[in-house]
Amino acid sequence: MRIFHLITHFSLGGAERVAANIAESQTHGMEYHVVEIMRGRTAYTPKFIAELEKAGVRCHRSWMPDVSFHFLFERIAALLFPLRMLYIMLRWRPDVIHTHTETPDLALYVFSRVFPRMLRRVKIVRTIHNTRLWTGLPRTAQCVEAFFKSHNANIAISDSVRDSYAERFGEVPPIINNGVAEVEQKNYFNISTPQGVHLSQVHQQHLNTSGGALVSSAPTTPPLGFCRLPEQEHLNILFAGRLEPQKGVVVLCKVLKMLAGDARFFFTIAGDGSQRTLVEQTLAEIAAEGKPLNAELVPPIFGLAGYMQSFDYLFMPSEFEGLSMLSMEASLNRLPVIANACPGLADTLPADWSLLAHGNNIDDYRRIFNLLPTANRNALTQQAYAFAKERFSVRTMQERYEAWYKAERSIC
């Protein structure tokens, strides 16, 4: 059986990670391909492709540049996709086409309108990764969702995704939870090449050694987690993800200001996106006030799951999620999560999880961070690990999708 996954780009993203985890299945008789709609061009791209090819997955690159501007280039890519997809259909004759996120969803819908007969013998599968779809595009939503519902294609990744889809589009899709795996750990703070550039290299005029701010491009924080040093006095907090409104970047900046100069904590902010400037400005303002800078901004970390035990806590003030892969990976790799109790994120943590804020309330975060220095981190780690281990297995996810590919009708 030949399965084609359509993703936005070969780059860092939760949906791309899910597609890769499915496609890397070694089930006999399954041949996996991954097709990008827009050409990934990040530092992560060649590593992502190499990982897939090592697992025997064939990767199909796009020539359409990956540019984000009010979903304009994504729509252009979708409109140009049919001719490229026609070649794929004639050359490879896939048995299953599996789409992930709005850009591939739209691209396949456009192909179905241009070449309606080409999909008659192809099973369509579509994973819904988010609780919010087609923001600002109601007419597009109506057309695309009608297409996928007519093919009985929809699969949700969590209860919250299923419920939000049912409320808006009137269908209750089955659920297949995302799967994650435990990863061999390395020391992030003891690697030969720094993972990123500190803010000190962007706003050098604000930073000086007399104020205790960072002035070096090499990490100055001692290692934590599996290689914890006894003299380490502060807690190392990781924020990792796209610097976009969905991820709660505004709240992150408020917390950075709230804890500015607090020697109990050090924040590593790993990410990039449209709100990167906001983070840079926040850290520059803190430094300009003469407070010791207890944070650094670095690019996204490739293979992040393999560095998680280098940190004490993961901070996730997301406004909404589908089903957070990052939170699941953190729990399974023994990194406790401080999170906003939003749909898709709260689903990944125990019901009685004590590190949850509600409505991204700053007072909740103040209370949580004040409790951290005396919290029983080992107990928190084990609680989250046991929860994730029981619910989120990569192999279980692969087997359920492969059963769905083979089935004539719904089996979830």
Predicted segment positions?
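Aromatic "clamp/platform" in nucleotide-sugar-dependent glycosyltransferases that forms part
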Residues: P300, E319
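Carbohydrate-associated surface elements
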Residues: S160, G179
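A conserved mid-protein helix/loop that constitutes part of the nucleotide-sugar donor-binding site
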Residues: G13-E24, L235, F239-M258, S274-T277, ...
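Short hydrophobic beta-strand element within catalytic cores of glycosyltransferases
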Residues: P336-A339
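Conserved acidic donor-binding segment of nucleotide-sugar-dependent glycosyltransferases
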Residues: A351-D363, N370-N376
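A charged, aromatic-enriched C-terminal amphipathic alpha-helix characteristic of glycosyltransferases
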Residues: N378-K406
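N-terminal strand-loop element at the rim of the active site
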Residues: H5-F73, A166, G273-S274
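Short His-centered aromatic/hydrophobic patch
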Residues: T99-D105, I128
